[in-house]
């Protein structure tokens, strides 16, 4: 997932530019500074502590003329923290892992029998480091940047993030992994918190649940090339304050294979990693 990455670099830029006025709540979520504070407390913590946004996702293959087919699940998390500057701007330092699972047994997979090609594919799990973003300092009188709304006792943050940029895996270099010259996808988040939790000014972080949906191309390791169709991701998640709060199988697999993902990155670096750039690093193009 890309969490707020399940936020990639282009998505983070779109989010930072999103300027939407919203009704005022008992907590200040209408001004730019109030919304920045609310966003930080919902997404992670305003005091710089690590928080873990876990997710549970079902992945469907959508082929023209066919009923969408559940092909696997993916469970994982993003670990991130905010670093605030004296001028009011902030950086979000994060990285994320997600593991593909058998939809029936829930076991973390090493290989996957592709029902479309009848080939057995070696899985490359998601290990994106970093997944960073920047948020400029709020300006006096500036409208709110984030689409936050009140709904009864709840505060809801809704983000739609369309993505389009040159594919890191170009067809000439990766003929069976690439779906074309452009990477086209979209991510959709809805975060939920309680108004009463946000009204507690001493709470640097508040409980959050969220939903996540995504449309995206075939994954490189599926080796589907330009075959018509795409992937549809349907998931939900919850924020946790500690690594030990995550599901046991995700924790154990992470400790055994990606131990550095138990905490956020130490410093802000670019560019961000995606499943496509990670694949390029792990699997050199044929002939190279």
Q: Model segments located where?
A:
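Predominantly extracellular/secreted and cell-surface proteins with exposed
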Residues: 67-201
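N-terminal segment immediately downstream of the Sec signal-peptide cleavage site
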Residues: 26-102, 110, 235-241, 248, ...
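Bacterial N-terminal signal peptides
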Residues: 10-22
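Absolute N-terminal positional cue centered near the fourth residue
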Residues: 3-5, 20-25
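Bacterial N-terminal signal peptides that target proteins for export
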Residues: 1-12
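A eukaryote-biased signal for long
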Residues: 163-288
